[in-house]
């Protein structure tokens, strides 16, 4: 009996971020770095969700605009954005977000499946949600976000 209770009380740790006023979380173990505003070089003929590339300590990193990836309106011109760096298949990717907030531990027992009201695009890139003080934290699946075969 105790074992089942302790499993329900396990905590998941997330880096919380905001994309177009939506609170999101990505598992902290998948995050390599958090970056402030970076110079991004546009890549000709790249899909629209590829913002370009940036230099991270001498390593070229593909920058993915999460607003475009999630089919949201573009960020206001001149708005400073942050990057959450994740690794997939040995390559580094920077997910451009509006803001990175905090690292948060949440009980696994509070995790819920995606609600039916979540748009098709959001549901395709999320694993579920947490309800926090009247806000919905959408847990993003970084692997799916980085799979460009699912683009558009």
What function would you assign to each model-found segment?
Residues 1-152:
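An acidic, low-aromatic, low-complexity terminal/linker signal
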């Amino acid at each position: 009996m105790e074992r089942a209770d302790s499993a329900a009380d396990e905590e998941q740790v997330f880096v919380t971020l905001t994309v177009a006023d939506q609170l999101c979380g990505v598992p902290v173990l998948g995050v390599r770095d958090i970056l402030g505003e970076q110079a991004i070089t546009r890549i000709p003929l790249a899909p629209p969700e590829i913002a370009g590339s940036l230099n991270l300590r001498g390593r070229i990193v593909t920058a993915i605009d999460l607003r475009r990836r999630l089919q949201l309106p573009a960020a206001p011109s001149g708005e400073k954005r942050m990057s959450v760096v994740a690794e997939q298949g040995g390559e580094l990717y920077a997910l451009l977000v509006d803001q990175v907030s905090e690292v948060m531990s949440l009980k696994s027992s509070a995790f819920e499946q995606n609600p039916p009201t979540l748009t098709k695009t959001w549901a395709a890139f999320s694993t579920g949600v947490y309800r926090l003080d009247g806000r919905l934290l959408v847990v993003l699946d970084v692997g799916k976000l980085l799979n460009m075969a699912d683009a558009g």
